[in-house]
Design a protein with these regions (language model features):
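N-terminal binding-site loop/beta-alpha segment at the start of enzyme catalytic domains
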Residues: 1-77, 330, 334-336
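Aromatic-lined glycan-binding groove of carbohydrate-active enzymes
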Residues: 183-221, 256
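Short, well-ordered coil/turn segments that N-cap beta-strands
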Residues: 11-16, 47-49, 73-77, 114-118, ...
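Terminal-tail/helix-coil boundary detector
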Residues: 193, 221-248, 252, 267, ...
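Conserved, mostly hydrophobic/aromatic
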Residues: 18, 36, 51, 66, ...
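Glycine/proline-rich, positively charged
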Residues: 88-182, 186, 196-197
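N-terminal small/glycine-rich loop or linker at the start of catalytic domains
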Residues: 9-27, 80-93, 116, 121
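Active-site beta-loop-alpha junctions enriched in small/polar residues
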Residues: 21-23, 54-56, 82-86, 122-125, ...
């Protein structure tokens, strides 16, 4: 089956990218460095050519790993990283001041062992800094050749339009899956209007949209799903009837549930490039092959109906996490 590459700014990439956060944090302890390096190289061997990291992942260790493991293969893939969510003395901080963005970029370039970062995102909105000021710094980095493309993450359509007015935005990254469809409120339309590639993270619903999703009681102590209501009880169990319907469809189609979930994001918009993450070589192969799963319009419509936003139980984020993003919410979420 011939796979059509997808547009990412002036580049074209394989329809499924690789999110690298899992190798250092999010769902458990960091991976063994040698095993993580082997996984990254296997990804490139397989044909992945869009890798996503961030300053905050592993407090810089994720970028360092990629820089070391793929130093001699930089021409084979598009490298994305992120600023604004930073670390200092082992603690997270948010800083989108122009001078902070430029300093963070220099540090990322050093860790990644690169002269230029292909795609550089603002990881979160900073309520203390106008987006126009931050974008001015990002535009400067493009002019200086430090970055090639500018991206935004976890921001709404309003901030996207303001940012794009300062400098073209190549990509918008936000959580998007059958479980979390908030980008459909406004961001996907704004991306389409402005010619911005949409990059869904967690397209497998943080592991829930799988053949055998881990139960909350089995989460590792460091698993961030422990504090996200939708992935804890009672909501984990309450959403199982939706999952079972999708699992039946996947079984009928001869694909895994995770492949169906990724294929759904690909079918929703030709400008979507999902970036599922994994520490497993098997899941790496499965996710890559999801680009070969073709959904008919009626299958997409069926999944849309099963996972209607109002049918999915539990908030995506707790109040603190929700306050850190600028993504739109459905009216029923605001009154819950």
């Amino acid at each position: 089956m011939s796979i059509t590459p997808r547009k990412l700014g002036p580049e074209t990439v394989y329809p499924v990218g690789l999110g690298c956060m899992n190798l250092h944090h999010g769902y458990g302890p960091p991976s063994d460095e040698a095993e993580a390096a082997a996984l990254l190289n296997e990804a490139l061997d397989m044909g992945y050519n869009f890798l996503d990291t961030a300053t905050i992942y592993g407090f810089g260790k994720n970028e360092t790993l990629i820089g070391k493991a793929l130093k001699d293969r930089q021409g084979e893939f598009v490298q994305a990283s992120k600023c604004v969510m930073l670390f200092e003395d082992g603690k997270r901080k948010l800083d989108a001041r122009p001078e902070s963005i430029k300093a963070a970029c220099e540090a990322s370039l050093k860790r990644l062992q690169r002269e230029t970062i292909d795609l550089y995102y603002m990881h979160r909105p900073d309520p203390n800094v106008p987006i126009e000021d931050s974008m001015g710094a990002m535009a400067d980095l493009v002019t200086e050749g430090k970055i090639r493309m500018v991206g935004l993450s976890e921001m709404g359509a309003g901030l996207l339009r303001r940012a794009h007015a300062v400098h073209p935005v190549a990509a918008m990254q936000s959580e998007y899956s059958l479980l979390t469809r908030n980008p459909e409120i406004a961001v996907l339309d704004a991306c389409k209007e402005l010619g911005v590639t949409f990059v869904p993270f967690s397209p497998v619903g943080r592991g829930y949209l799988a053949d055998n999703p881990p139960a909350p009681k089995d989460y590792h102590a460091a698993d961030m799903r422990r504090i996200f209501p939708r992935w804890t009880e009672p909501y984990w169990t309450e959403n199982l009837p939706l999952l079972k319907q999708a699992q039946e469809m996947a079984g009928d189609m001869g694909c895994t549930m995770s492949q169906l979930a990724i294929a759904w994001t690909l079918a929703k918009d030709a400008a979507c490039v999902p970036i599922p993450g994994t520490t497993s070589a098997k899941h790496l192969r499965d996710n890559f092959a999801a680009a070969q799963v073709s959904l008919a319009p009626e299958q997409v419509a069926h999944l849309d109906a099963v996972f209607a936003p109002e049918a999915v139980k539990g908030p995506r984020y707790n109040a603190m996490a929700q306050a850190s993003v600028d993504t739109e919410q459905y009216p029923f979420e605001l009154t819950a």
